[in-house]
């Protein structure tokens, strides 16, 4: 294997030395790609032909604090944190996913500076960030999870997070969202919209609810609502369920309601998709799942009413980048639901395809 920083001459030497056609590129135990002889020939041909690839535009950022734990995971979660009041709850979710998938966690604290300032030259106070990161490191040690921490000075939050995703080869981005309505025309807020549109890895957006909602709802009876329209978007959300369920004891799992919204004009709605999804989910998690077909002209309103009437503690939604960013006639459905309910809402957007 070779590291991502290896020179092409070193790669070519190894290919010739061991008579190989390709080599895995690894960062620690994580496979980040494959390099072949064809790749090397293509780069050499481009250089001989005068083809120059312009570097990607990036906003300057500067690392002022960093810790590293053993690189023992098969992947990495990037967890940007800023608010001490929500950091622990977000870390609980990230830790549950890390245990389930054998991932490490990168905790990132960003400090913003004006556009005209150089992040490398501005004096910043890192005490608050280091205090917060130390708290998460203690939680990680208690749970035997490999955690890395970093404080970066950036001019733009979204650009700083995207740069970290590229540098750390992140497999998953988990970020919090306050649920507040943007005044700039953005759906979730400018930085979050940018990350939903551009982050190449799987992305999970978490709007935390009140203190009695997930993941702090273990001392009461609770209902988790999973609205679905079927297809790959639903599978993304359902794939997260085993990780989330691991936060509660097996004897005290929440009730799972799998709901699908049907148009009132459908006299005989096709329930087969809902039934198949219910059966596969029950088999995967070995727990009862309640199928819930609902007639409504407004999917968002139907979900909101159900959450309020049944006091759900979590709503789990799967969505594509397009459905998260496109403004529908009645507004963006996931953001409408997330803003209207008091419980925790988790939105899952899959990895972007090339």
Question: What residue ranges belong to the model's regions?
Answer:
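The conserved cystathionine-beta-synthase
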Residues: 2-19, 26, 84-85
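Intrinsically disordered or low-complexity boundary/linker segments at protein termini
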Residues: 27-30, 36-92, 96, 110-114, ...
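Non-catalytic interaction/regulatory modules that flank or connect domains
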Residues: 76-142, 146, 154
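Acidic, proline/glycine-rich short linear motifs
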Residues: 109-131, 251, 257-277
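Charged docking surfaces used in two-component/phosphorelay signaling
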Residues: 151-160, 295-300
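Charged helix-capping and loop-helix junction motifs
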Residues: 188-191, 273-275, 329-334
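A short, acidic, amphipathic alpha-helical segment used as a generic capping/interface helix at domain edges
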Residues: 272-279, 295-311
């Amino acid at each position: 294997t070779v590291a991502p920083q290896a020179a092409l001459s070193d790669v070519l030497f190894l290919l010739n030395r061991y008579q190989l056609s390709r080599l895995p590129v690894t960062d620690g135990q994580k496979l980040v790609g494959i390099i072949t002889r064809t790749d090397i020939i293509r780069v050499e041909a481009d250089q001989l032909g005068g083809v120059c690839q312009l570097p990607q535009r990036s906003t300057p950022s500067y690392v002022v604090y960093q810790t590293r734990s053993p690189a023992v995971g098969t992947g990495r979660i990037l967890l940007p944190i800023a608010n001490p009041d929500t950091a622990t709850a977000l870390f609980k979710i990230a830790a549950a996913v890390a245990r389930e998938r054998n991932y490490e966690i990168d905790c990132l604290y960003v400090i913003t500076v004006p556009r005209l300032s150089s992040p490398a030259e501005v004096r910043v106070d890192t005490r608050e960030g280091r205090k917060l990161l130390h708290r998460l490191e203690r939680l990680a040690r208690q749970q035997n999870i490999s955690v890395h921490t970093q404080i970066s000075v950036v001019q733009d939050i979204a650009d700083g997070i995207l740069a970290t995703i590229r540098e750390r080869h992140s497999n998953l981005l988990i970020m919090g969202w306050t649920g507040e309505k943007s005044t700039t025309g953005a759906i979730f807020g400018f930085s979050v919209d940018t990350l939903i549109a551009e982050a190449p890895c799987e992305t999970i957006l978490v709007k935390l609810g009140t203190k009695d909602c997930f993941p702090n709802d273990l001392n009461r009876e609770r209902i988790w609502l999973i609205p679905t329209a079927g297809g790959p978007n639903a599978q993304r959300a359902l794939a997260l369920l085993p990780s989330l369920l691991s936060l509660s004891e097996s004897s005290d799992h929440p009730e799972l309601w799998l709901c699908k919204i049907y148009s009132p004009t459908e006299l005989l709605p096709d329930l087969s998709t809902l039934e198949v999804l219910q059966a596969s989910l029950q088999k995967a998690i070995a727990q009862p799942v309640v199928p819930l077909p609902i007639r409504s002209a407004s999917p968002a309103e139907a979900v909101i009413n159900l959450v309020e009437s049944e006091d759900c503690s979590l709503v789990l939604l799967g969505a594509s980048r397009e459905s998260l960013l496109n403004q529908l006639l009645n507004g963006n459905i996931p953001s409408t639901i997330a803003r209207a309910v008091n419980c925790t809402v988790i939105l899952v957007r899959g990895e972007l395809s090339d």
